[in-house]
């Protein structure tokens, strides 16, 4: 059925649109953006007082399927995405088996086609088993549907292997995404190395562990010409190096997470495992540098790094529990509160970070409301008041530091390929 999204403020950075208008979707695609559109057979969504944007893209999500379905599935993770205003998500390869072959990539594509509430795009591994030694079947994975390659939380430590991976990535025109961490510097660490790690008696992860890897990889990106992307950037020096590379013509991009611009290590509740993630929450100075990078345009995208873990694993001693938090349902609200409400960035810039920014890296053919584009739309309110109850999350996991937080601003409706998948009014996910 056609759908008309009526009377919202339409902001589409891809087409430089910012005006009150209607959005008309027919047969799963954008048919028009203009005032006073109507169709007697169309479903109507009243967006008066709301922002209507291209469907948001999260380029860094862990769906855990296959292999870890007790933590998340493609179905449950995609439902959490819909409830967070995301219409497209890219899933990392740290599954069991690792997504290092066309067989696993095809499995994810087929499961997503039949069960996902939103568009799901798989990311293939750089190396077999993400072991950092032998390159995975990159060409075969791309043919099966992979949109990028990454070993995710297992950085490619061997520079020779990384060089070869970049050469292959360039030949297949795929971005290569690196979790930047020198494991020799960070080994055994549980939180940011600084005054708080000393105070709490926890081993630290120095900012230098990220900086060293970014520096090495920028040299390799210059050597190979690969499209290189830094995942969840978290340090001042790393942001500066990415800016240096971009200013010298390197095809380098980076993303950051809502928790890295919304929290610092000073905000951590001592020994609360819901504040344990990697990269860790850094000092206030590093957090401020991340915000500066978002303002300046050095950072291309906001990505959640949604990393579900069941309570049986996460609620252990801080030193023993796994890294990571869920984030799909709180990302937009955090960005509105921490970035837009204080006047640090505009609504248009926020939407760029969730649409044209990740689209420029992943090249999914999404992230715009121009006629003919897929009918993916995110409707949100900058002011709606709501309280996040992690126990009501669509995710299978509950590991969030934002439980019981009252937000001002958040998603109102998620439309995927012309179908209403979630709305705040009904809270029903289809």
UniProtKB/Swiss-Prot annotation:
InterPro entries with a match to the protein in the record: Amidohydro-rel, DHOase, DHOase/Allantoinase_Hydrolase, Dihydroorotase_CS, Metal-dep_hydrolase_composite, Metal_Hydrolase
Positions bound to Zn(2+) 1: 60, 62, 152, 305
SUPFAM superfamilies: Composite domain of metallo-dependent hydrolases (SSF51338), Metallo-dependent hydrolases (SSF51556)
GO cellular component terms, A-Z: cytoplasm
One annotated GO biological process: purine nucleobase catabolic process
Keyword field contains Zinc: yes
Keyword list, A-Z: Hydrolase, Metal-binding, Pyrimidine biosynthesis, Zinc
Pathway noted in the entry: Pyrimidine metabolism; UMP biosynthesis via de novo pathway; (S)-dihydroorotate from bicarbonate: step 3/3
Protein name as it appears in the record: Dihydroorotase
Source species of the chain: Solibacter usitatus (strain Ellin6076)
Source taxonomy: Bacteria, Pseudomonadati, Acidobacteriota, Terriglobia, Bryobacterales
Gene: pyrC
């Amino acid at each position: 059925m056609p759908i008309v999204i009526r009377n919202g403020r339409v902001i589409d950075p891809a087409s430089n649109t910012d005006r009150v208008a209607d959005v008309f979707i027919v047969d799963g695609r954008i048919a028009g953006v203009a005032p006073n559109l109507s169709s007697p057979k169309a479903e109507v969504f009243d967006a008066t007082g709301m922002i209507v944007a291209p469907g948001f893209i999260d380029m860094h999500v862990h769906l855990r399927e296959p292999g870890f379905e007790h933590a998340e599935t493609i179905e449950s993770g995609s439902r959490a995405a819909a409830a967070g205003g995301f219409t497209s998500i890219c899933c990392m390869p740290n599954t069991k088996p690792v997504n290092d072959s066309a067989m696993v990539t095809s499995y994810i594509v087929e499961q997503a086609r039949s069960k996902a509430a939103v568009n799901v795009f798989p990311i293939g591994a750089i190396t077999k088993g993400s072991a950092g030694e032998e390159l995975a079947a990159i060409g075969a994975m791309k043919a099966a549907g992979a949109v990028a390659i990454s070993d995710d939380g297992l950085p490619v430590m061997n520079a020779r292997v990384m060089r070869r991976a970049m050469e292959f990535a360039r030949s297949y025109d795929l971005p290569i995404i690196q979790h930047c961490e020198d494991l020799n510097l960070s080994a055994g660490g549980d939180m940011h190395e600084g005054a708080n790690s000393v105070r709490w008696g926890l081993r630290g992860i120095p900012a230098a562990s990220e900086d060293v890897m970014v520096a090495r990889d920028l040299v390799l990106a210059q050597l190979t010409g690969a499209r290189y992307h830094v995942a969840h950037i978290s340090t001042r020096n790393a942001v500066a190096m990415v800016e240096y590379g971009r200013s010298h013509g390197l095809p380098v991009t980076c993303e950051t997470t809502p928790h890295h611009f919304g929290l610092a290590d000073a905000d951590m509740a001592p020994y609360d495992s819901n504040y344990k993630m990697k990269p860790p929450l850094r000092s206030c100075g590093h957090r401020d540098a991340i915000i500066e990078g978002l303002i300046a345009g050095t950072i291309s995208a906001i990505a959640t790094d949604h990393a579900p873990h069941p309570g049986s694993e996460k609620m252990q001693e801080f030193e023993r529990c796994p890294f990571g938090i869920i984030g799909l349902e709180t990302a937009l609200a955090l960005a509105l509160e921490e970035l837009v409400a204080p006047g640090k960035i505009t609504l248009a810039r926020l939407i760029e970070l969730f649409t044209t920014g990740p689209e420029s890296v992943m090249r999914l053919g999404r992230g715009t409301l121009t006629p003919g584009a897929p009918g993916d739309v995110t409707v949100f309110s900058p002011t709606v008041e709501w309280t996040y109850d992690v126990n009501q999350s669509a995710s299978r996991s509950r590991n969030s530091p934002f439980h019981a937080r009252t937000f001002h601003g958040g998603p109102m409706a998620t439309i995927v390929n012309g179908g209403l998948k979630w709305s705040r009014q009904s809270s029903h996910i289809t």
